[in-house]
Amino acid sequence: MNQLYLVPDIQDMEHSVQLAEEYGCAFEYNDFYAPAVLDDPKKQEEIIAHYKKYRSDFSKDTMHGAFLDVTIHSSDARIREVSALRIHQSMEIAKKLGLRGVVFHTGRLAGFRVDYYLTQWKEMNAAFFRELAEKYPEQQIYMENMFDEAPDVLAGLAEEMKEVKNFGVCLDYAHAALTGCTGREWVETLA
């Protein structure tokens, strides 16, 4: 992304806009990942209308997509179905706003490194996000570490998806700092 992002405070947009201008930041919206918002189109429109009062160009901005309980790699078809719905809802909001991209989380079970699970995680995420990238060519799709204990699994997905032009990884350094790996290891492995 090579861009500094600021999460705007919807209650104090004047200050958020001022900070963004002062530091050359784009916005990363964190208002649209909650199930209550995703289930309420009226609430979505209210949030969008509020942001549009303060900004007309969203082309450098991103948003956090749905991530609470989202498990696209689940062996349970019904969980995958709801997870796919939430991800598609996120992409539609991004498309409506004209955002640069959407950040999703890996959704992995922290510390669970059984081979079949990691293989399934990579294969199912690659298939799903490859298809999603084709459907939404105007938006970037980023996969961010969250409770991942090391960068290798996310790096494996990035390698698998390297030919997909609108897919990439997003390193959350604060999440990475909670692991036993150094920041350097995260950066070098994901680079």
Where are each of the predicted segments found?
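Structural preference for beta-strand elements that scaffold enzyme active sites
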Residues: 3-5, 24-28, 58-62, 100-103, ...
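Histidine-acidic metal/acid-base catalytic patches
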Residues: 1-3, 14-21, 92, 154-168, ...
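Active-site-proximal loop/turn and secondary-structure-junction residues that shape catalytic pockets
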Residues: 10-12, 31-33, 67-69, 106-110, ...
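Active-site glycine- and acidic-residue-rich loops that bind
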Residues: 35-40, 144-151, 174-184
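Active-site acidic/histidine proton-transfer and metal-coordination neighborhood
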Residues: 73-168
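Flexible, charged surface loops at secondary-structure boundaries
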Residues: 20-22, 55, 134-136, 190-191
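N-terminal pre-domain/capping segments
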Residues: 1-70, 74-89
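Catalytic-core regions built around general acid/base machinery
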Residues: 43-58, 124-132, 185-189
